[in-house]
C-alpha cells in the first residue's frame, strides 16, 4: 500500500504539470478577442435584411442562404418560410448531382429519401 502511495506522490506533480502546460499551449498569443454575435449584428452595415444564421445581407428573408450550402438543401415551405436540411446521403452520382444543383436540388422529391419533397409532405402532415 505504501509503495503505491509513494508512486502516486511522484506521478501526480508530473501529470498536473502536463495538463497545466497543455492548457497554456492552447492559448494563442496575439489572437484578437472574439466579437460577440450581438456586436456583429448591431455593427453590421446591412441596409436590407440581415440573415440571423449567416449574417448575410439580402433583400428579403426569403433570400437567406443556408449556413452550410455544400451539405444542406434550402427547402421552401408553403407559407414562404424555409428550412435547411442535410442533403440526403447517397452513393448515386446522378442523385448527388441533382442535390448539388441549386435549382433542381430543392425541387427534388425522390421516394425513400428525406429531401425537400419529404419536407413538403411533412409540413402538410402526410408523412
UniProtKB/Swiss-Prot annotation:
What CDD domains does the annotation carry? LCL2-like
Claim: Signal is one of the keywords in the record = yes
Keywords from UniProt, A to Z, are:
Signal
Q: Which InterPro entries match?
A: LCL2
A GO biological process held by the record: ERAD pathway
Where does the signal peptide begin and end? 1-17
Q: Which residues cross the membrane?
A: none
Q: Which PANTHER family match?
A: LONG CHRONOLOGICAL LIFESPAN PROTEIN 2 (PTHR38425:SF1)
Q: What family is this protein classified in?
A: Belongs to the LCL2 family.
User: What is the annotated role of this protein in its UniProt record?
Assistant: Probable component of the endoplasmic reticulum-associated degradation (ERAD) pathway.
Stated name of the protein: Long chronological lifespan protein 2
Amino acid at each position: 500500500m505504501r509503495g503505491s502511495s509513494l508512486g502516486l506522490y511522484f506521478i501526480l506533480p508530473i501529470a498536473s504539470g502536463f495538463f497545466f502546460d497543455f492548457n497554456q499551449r492552447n492559448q494563442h498569443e496575439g489572437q484578437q478577442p472574439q466579437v460577440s454575435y450581438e456586436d456583429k449584428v448591431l455593427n453590421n452595415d446591412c441596409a436590407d435584411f440581415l440573415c440571423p444564421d449567416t449574417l448575410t445581407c439580402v433583400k428579403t428573408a426569403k433570400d437567406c442562404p443556408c449556413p452550410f450550402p455544400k451539405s444542406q438543401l434550402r427547402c421552401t415551405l408553403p407559407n414562404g418560410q424555409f428550412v435547411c436540411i442535410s442533403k440526403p446521403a447517397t452513393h448515386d452520382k446522378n442523385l448527388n448531382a441533382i442535390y448539388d444543383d441549386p435549382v433542381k436540388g430543392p425541387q427534388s422529391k425522390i421516394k425513400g429519401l428525406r429531401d425537400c419533397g419529404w419536407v413538403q409532405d411533412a409540413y402538410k402532415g402526410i408523412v
